């Protein structure tokens, strides 16, 4: 109902929407927010749809002052802001950014969202209608405003991470997180450098057991048992969930600098709900100087959002010695 969407958008400063798949239910909301200069935050992890929205609405958003911020949940706040946090520390200590960062999921306890599974299914369906989306999904720089950077380190099969001395497996959220990280870099004038490389994988442990686990994870469908959209875990399960993501910056002298981002609730529900709420509040209350446009979390809110997440959302951002 486009009329009711228009009325809603005209009556608020910021629309916070959790209604996905966004490629099915988001286009009119983004269109109306952009047209009326209303801010917008979502949980989108659908790069094909985001690519379309950027192409269709970015120019007008700059004109109307609408700040559209995609991916304000577990995809991709811990990863986007984790890289941003670490690069700021590297630049402060070494005078230039790290040209390579490895994202490594150390722990992730909790159920995946039924909406995440539905979004993936919708993306697969849209590929049949729009085969040109294959190129978007395969390109790590698909959201980087036409910029094409260096070839990225492969992350699609189990490998041994020699610097961490552990086997790592493909991480099913990497295809969206990596695109968002590269978009952030582009939006910030390539703060991380034009030669920046970034990949994400899931730590499984050392030795033969670690290898077997990594190969198993690489062969499975992590969303096979996800709940239906609108369904989810119990409060106890949400409260007992957590996650821990390590970021490893490889420096020119051969050393590394590590940062960790942790969350105190399950990633798909408990933590994500707090992240998107804090994003909306931050955007409206603390980012009045941010120009209109289509953003990722880091260039939109950066340090301001990190501070809010640590104060009110149960996240931590720390450098590890």
Write out the residue ranges for each language-model feature:
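Rossmann-fold NAD(P)-binding glycine/threonine-rich loop
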Residues: 44-66
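ADP-ribose/adenylate-binding Rossmann-like module
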Residues: 21, 30-50
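A generic structural signal for well-ordered alpha-helical segments
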Residues: 29-33, 57, 61, 309-310
């Amino acid at each position: 109902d486009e009329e009711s969407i228009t009325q809603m958008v005209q009556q608020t400063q910021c629309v916070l929407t959790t209604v996905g798949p966004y490629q099915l239910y988001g286009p009119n909301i983004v269109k109306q927010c952009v047209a009326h200069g209303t801010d917008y935050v979502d949980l989108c992890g659908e790069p094909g749809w985001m690519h379309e929205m950027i192409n269709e609405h970015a120019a007008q958003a700059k004109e109307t002052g609408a700040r559209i911020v995609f991916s304000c949940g577990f995809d991709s706040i811990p990863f986007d802001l984790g890289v941003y946090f670490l690069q700021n520390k590297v630049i402060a200590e070494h005078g230039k950014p790290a040209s390579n960062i490895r994202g490594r999921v150390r722990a992730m306890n909790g159920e995946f969202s039924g909406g995440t599974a539905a979004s993936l299914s919708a993306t697969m369906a849209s590929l049949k209608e729009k085969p040109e989306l294959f190129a978007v999904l395969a390109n790590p720089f698909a959201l980087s405003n036409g910029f094409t950077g260096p070839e990225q380190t492969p992350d699609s099969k189990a490998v041994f991470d020699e610097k961490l001395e552990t086997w790592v497996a493909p991480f099913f959220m990497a295809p969206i997180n990596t695109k968002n990280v590269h978009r952030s870099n582009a939006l910030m004038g390539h703060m991380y450098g034009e030669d920046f490389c970034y990949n994400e994988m899931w730590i499984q442990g050392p030795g033969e057991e670690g290898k077997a686990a990594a190969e198993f994870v690489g062969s499975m469908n992590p969303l096979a048992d996800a709940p239906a959209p609108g369904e989810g875990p119990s409060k106890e399960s949400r409260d007992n969930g957590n996650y821990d993501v390590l970021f490893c910056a490889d420096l020119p002298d051969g050393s590394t600098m590590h940062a960790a981002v942790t969350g105190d609730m399950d990633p798909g529900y408990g933590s994500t709900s707090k992240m998107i709420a804090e994003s909306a509040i931050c955007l409206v209350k603390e980012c009045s100087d941010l120009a209109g446009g289509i953003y990722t979390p880091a260039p939109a809110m950066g340090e301001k959002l990190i501070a809010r997440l640590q104060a009110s959302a149960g996240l931590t951002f720390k450098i590890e010695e």
